[in-house]
Structure formats: structure tokens, C-alpha cells
Amino acid sequence: MAKHSTQEVPATGPLYASHNTTRSPTQAPLGPEEGQERKRRRLEAVGPGPQQQQQQQHQQQQQQQTPTHTPSTQACARTGGPVDSNRTRDCDSTSQNPYRHPSDPDCAPVIHLRGDPNSLKCFRYRLQNGKKGLYCKASSTWRWSCEPENQSAFVTIWYTSVTQRAEFLANVKIPPGMQAILGHMSVF
């Protein structure tokens, strides 16, 4: 029978006393002393971890994305420019997406605000509490992964139309120290 102590032990989280003395599959020995077959059975009993689930989902998505071209879905226009010279666009202009760019039905007008992360968060909070009708949605603070951590952060603001974006810029003062970068972004 296992002994239980009533002595206080400093801990960062809650402690739970367990009266069950049987070993579960996750308490099995690990490492070189555990055979391959036993390890396989233990892992099967526990199920796939988050990383394995992510890999399985990625493989399934790749299998589903095999391109198929029929006469009705073939692209009819090519964009100009060195980066997009091989990118095609679908001619289907019947998209139900309300966020439209004249040349791409799946794009929305945006502003990328660039600046100090804390200032961006405060500005976004002020927008949510007073200017909600002047934009559609705002992102959380984000950064480019290839830049050093001490660089500026971004908040992206989406609009339903170029007119709404212009109205936003006419009525909202962008704080000093923030840069507003206008553009279009695919809607996801």
C-alpha cells in the first residue's frame, strides 16, 4: 500500500492525490530499455500527438489539392509583372465575396499599420470602442518571422470597399510613429 504524506510541498499548480496504484500506458518506461514493439503499442494506446495530427492533416490537404482544369474553370487572364508572370486568375466574376478588388474577386482593401506593438494594440482597442463602423475587421499584432525581434509589428485592418477605407482614413487620425501601408489582401 502506498504511503501518503500530509506534509506541505511547495508546488506551482494543484496537486492531486491518487489512490490508484496501477500503471497506465503513459507511465511505462521510456528510452533504450523499452523495446520497439512495446513503444509502438504504448503510442497507439495514447493516440497521435498534436504534431502527428498536424502532419496527417497536411498530407491529406496535399492529396486533395491536385489541380484539375476543365474548360469552365481554366484561367483566361494573366497578371503582368515578373513575380506573377505565371500566376493565372479565374474569370469567374460571380463570386459572392463582398470584399472585392476590381481585378481579383477574392481580395479586400486593407491597411497594414506598422509601429510599436503596444501602441498598435492600444490603437486597435480604441478603434473597437469608437470606430467599429469604419472598418470590417482588425488582426492581432503580428510580425514578419525573418526580421529581428526588435523591429516593428503590424496590425492589418480589412475593409468592405475602397470607399470604406477612404472614409476610415478621412475620419481616423493615425497616431504619430505609426505608418499606414495601403494595399489589397486575399480574404481567408
Curated annotation (Swiss-Prot):
Single annotated GO MF: DNA-binding transcription factor activity
Keywords assigned: Host nucleus
Protein known as: Protein E8^E2C
InterPro entries: E2/EBNA1_C_sf (IPR035975), Nucleotide-bd_a/b_plait_sf (IPR012677), Papillomavirus_E2_C (IPR000427)
Subcellular location, record wording: Host nucleus
Primary localization class, coarse: host cell
Highest taxon in the source lineage: Viruses
UniProt-annotated stretches for the region Disordered: 1-105
Low complexity: compositionally biased ranges: 51-65
A GO-annotated cellular component: host cell nucleus
Role description: Plays a role in limiting the replication of viral DNA in keratinocytes. Recruits the host NCoR/SMRT complex to viral replication foci to mediate repression of both viral replication and transcription.
